């Protein structure tokens, strides 16, 4: 058999770029990186009230992260609350180590036949969840995979001794935080000479609040 022969599609497969960790903006800053080997099933858009909810959903947020194509649905398993084995020391395991590998793409699928509380160990929330959307949004806050990309920021690294208190659950939360390092929204108020207010803000609502409180009486 000729060594140069290739099966159909092999050349195209070989041309696919490998995932470049160094080029990734989240290099060495994602607590739970094992999900790079998995491709979760797509959510039905009808499960979400708005496009924003869909884009922020746990499974959809990694759709363009360079995962290899191909379905692994036969190997994919949604963990249920019964899979979480709570230990006396406050830890949790799926026969010991579930949380060491679980990502926010593997969230307990509660039945919601009755209002349910969060099963995450140590969760202090008293909220009762009646829909999967609200529960998923809450539950993934326990897994903060994104960290500030400004090195001097206290939110830029994950401190094992302070787990769960640093970082952000979604890219949107991180982007909102990072905007504070480089506020670019300038107050639009001008005085009688046409000179503009010098205050800048990272959020439009904060600028409007400033405008209303400070300049509204002028």
From Swiss-Prot:
The keyword Transcription regulation applies. GO terms for cellular component: nucleus. Keywords: Metal-binding, Nucleus, Transcription, Transcription regulation, Zinc, Zinc-finger. One of its GO terms (molecular function) is zinc ion binding. A zinc finger (C2H2-type) spans 185-215. It comes from the Eukaryota. Disruption phenotype: Blocks harzianum A production and reduces expression of the trichothecene biosynthesis genes, as well as of mevalonate biosynthetic genes required for synthesis of farnesyl diphosphate (FPP), the primary metabolite that feeds into trichothecene biosynthesis. Leads to increased expression of 10 of 49 secondary metabolite (SM) biosynthetic gene clusters in T.arundinaceum and reduced expression of 5 SM biosynthetic gene clusters. Residues 154-181 are annotated as: Disordered. InterPro entries: Znf_C2H2_type. It is found in: Nucleus. Transcriptional activator of part of the trichothecene biosynthesis cluster that mediates the production of the antimicrobial trichothecene harzianum A (HA) that plays a role in Botrytis cinerea antagonistic activity and plant defense priming. Regulates expression of both trichothecene and mevalonate pathway genes. This is Trichothecene biosynthesis transcription regulator TRI6. It comes from Trichoderma arundinaceum.
């Amino acid at each position: 058999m000729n060594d140069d022969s290739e099966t159909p599609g092999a050349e195209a497969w070989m041309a696919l770029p490998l995932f470049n960790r160094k080029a990734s903006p989240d290099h060495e800053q994602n607590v739970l990186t094992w999900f790079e080997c998995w491709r979760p099933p797509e959510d039905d858009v009808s499960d979400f009230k708005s496009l924003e909810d869909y884009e922020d959903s746990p499974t959809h947020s990694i759709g363009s992260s360079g995962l290899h194509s191909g379905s692994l649905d036969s190997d994919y398993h949604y963990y249920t609350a019964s899979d979480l084995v709570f230990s006396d020391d406050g830890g949790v395991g799926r026969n010991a180590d579930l949380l060491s590998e679980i990502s926010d793409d593997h969230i307990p699928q509660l039945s919601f036949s009755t209002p349910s509380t969060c099963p995450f160990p140590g969760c202090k929330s008293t909220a009762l969840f009646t829909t999967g959307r609200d529960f998923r949004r809450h539950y993934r806050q326990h897994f903060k995979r994104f960290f500030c990309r400004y090195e001097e920021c206290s939110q830029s690294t994950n401190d094992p001794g302070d787990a769960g208190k640093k970082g952000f659950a979604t890219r949107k939360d991180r982007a909102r935080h990072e905007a504070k390092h480089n506020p670019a929204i300038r107050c639009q108020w001008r005085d009688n000479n046409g000179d503009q207010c010098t205050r800048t803000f990272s959020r439009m609502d904060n600028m409007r609040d400033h405008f209303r409180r400070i300049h509204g009486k002028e």
